[in-house]
């Protein structure tokens, strides 16, 4: 008699599919145990780690026996009719703990990694077109049913390192997809994914930088500029910081690409680059004449204000032109 296939999903809420039905573990600890074994993707999880995840620093004396009961319940959920104490096919005793016997066909996390790794391999060898890389990465990202692995579990469980590490795999793949789409000249292929990711985590600067660049490349120049302004305000309000170098560079790229590059401040010329380090050297007191530091700092502030004003005017012209052109097709 053929065994019924079982599929596990953790890229979003934890799900199990068997024979067209979706049996749900009844107890929160059973769901947490199944999720922990799934995010470890076929690797054994020691009993001590399971105890720590389920109870933290104050486990009951009966913790190991409770885990064994949870394992038995999960085994019968996955394989109805399984005799008591039988190991079954999926939840295996292994290396002083337990292992979920899964592969890329039965677990969405492993399937995501398989497709993502194939895309990265093709991108690294340079022989495949960027468009193919984009297609594979968007296929992999499409397996996620939300921004977080094992969504719905208690936060104290999801804060564990194994869950957080898997959470980081999604934005990393999305950054790769955005970069490949920009190289391929197909920004629209990832735009909705980037918009959703920015809504899920509005302070993720690397993703915001790619959203700004992708919006502009897709013809949404005004939205790219307004996205940067909103991000800058949010970072200041929520974190008390200015945009980092990557996000600032993305914004500057959009302004330059608009054809209205900010002009150099008055007096700046071929020698401006050579003097760029002067304020820092003057403040450090290395080789500067007395009083030179004040003059250098004043000159630097004047230059910064001039550049900021010129960039603001260039940005306004870029936004006006984008709005006049109307939305991209």
Where are these regions (language model features)?
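DNA major-groove recognition helices of helix-turn-helix
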Residues: 16, 30-37, 50, 67-81, ...
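Generic start-of-chain signal for non-secretory N-termini
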Residues: 1-11
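A structural micro-motif at secondary-structure boundaries
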Residues: 10-31
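Intrinsically disordered, charged and Pro/Gly-enriched terminal/linker segments
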Residues: 2, 23-24, 28, 39-42, ...
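Residue-identity detector for glycine
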Residues: 267-277, 285-287, 291-295, 309, ...
